[in-house]
Amino acid sequence: MDDFAEFFPTLVLDEPEVARRPARDAEVLAILADAERPGGSNCTAWCVVA
């Protein structure tokens, strides 16, 4: 997950509203992590990122 923090720092570090919603942040990172694994749902991850 640390790799995602490097590429998407605003998801976990920069925005004050993110600090108030760590569960939502964890959910987004979990979706992105799932997309990285073989057979993961890339479409879902792209929708979240977009």
UniProtKB/Swiss-Prot annotation:
Keywords: Cell membrane, Lipoprotein, Membrane, Methylation, Pheromone, Prenylation. A lipid is attached at C47 (S-farnesyl cysteine). The keyword Membrane applies. The modification Cysteine methyl ester is found at C47. GO terms for cellular component: plasma membrane. Disulfide bonds: none annotated. InterPro entries: Pheromone. It is a lipid-anchor. This is Mating-type pheromone BAP1(3). It comes from Schizophyllum commune.
